[in-house]
Amino acid sequence: MSVVDRISAWARKKSPWLIHFNTGACNACDIEVLATLTPHYDVERFGIQLKGSPRHADVLVCSGPITMQQKERLKTIYDQMPEPKFVVAVGTCACSGGVFNGCYCVEGGIDASIPVDMYVPGCPAKPEAIIDGMVKLLKVFDKDKKKSEGRSQNGKRSE
């Protein structure tokens, strides 16, 4: 791993940047996600910042169930994010489809469309739970860094 890659991995671990996407929620979880980003909770002390572009984000925070209308948009946003990328499902609807599961226009939770790394249940999920999930995700960042350091360019473990 080159010096630039190591610095990039360290910076990414220390300061994950988020993009938030509502896939069809009632907006209760959106209010809680945005409340988490206010000075009252001060998540910037963990280096967490909200970004406006998926090309600059490490973590995709999703709220709401997957609707047919939003499914392709979600995949597009996910594909635009640089590697390594992580997905957090916030709220019961994002985790499992919630009360909307079984509706004609709902396909289920976020994991019905893209892989999810962290689930934060709740209706709505409280800011404290979202922060707890993000702190646990920071540990995944560290494991991902260690895993990538132990692998060569072709994906096999280096000797």
Where are these regions (language model features)?
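Iron-sulfur-associated redox domains of electron-transfer enzymes in respiratory
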Residues: 1-149, 157-159
